[in-house]
């Protein structure tokens, strides 16, 4: 079962506004991205999982806890991109304007190994379905 996390009200308003804009302007996407989504994911994961955030733009990892460093990714899509391997990877997916789910919370190496080839921008993509399969395999192992 996937853990669901309520989004803080200011974040929910952002996603509700994008849904309203998409309804007003059919065929246009108003997808939050970049630093905004990264920062949202970091604070949501930190609160939900008891993580301590590093200062902004910490290379490789966004947070830590008693077990070590954590990289955090948030998406509303079907995949994430990674620049490098990490110790622990937490991936969240926005499932509604009010809620996100934890898709993956585990070791970074299996995700890095399963990610696609390096792209021109230096990133490797991995689908959420692959991450779910990795999580399920490590849970049953």
Model regions: which residues?
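Nucleic-acid endonuclease domains
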Residues: 1-67, 73-141
């Amino acid at each position: 079962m996937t853990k669901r996390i309520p989004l803080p009200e200011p974040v929910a308003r952002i996603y509700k506004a994008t849904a309203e804009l998409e309804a007003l302007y059919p065929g246009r996407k108003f997808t939050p991205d970049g630093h905004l989504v990264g920062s949202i994911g970091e604070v949501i994961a930190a609160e939900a999982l008891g993580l301590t955030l590093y200062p902004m733009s910490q290379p490789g990892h966004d947070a830590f806890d008693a077990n070590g460093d954590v990289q955090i990714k948030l998406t509303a899509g079907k995949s994430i991109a990674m620049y490098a391997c990490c110790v622990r990877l937490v991936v969240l997916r926005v499932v509604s304007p009010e809620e996100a789910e934890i898709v993956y919370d585990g070791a970074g190496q299996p995700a890095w190994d399963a990610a696609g080839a390096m792209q021109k921008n230096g990133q490797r993509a991995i689908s959420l379905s692959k991450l779910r399969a990795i999580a399920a395999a490590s849970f049953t192992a």
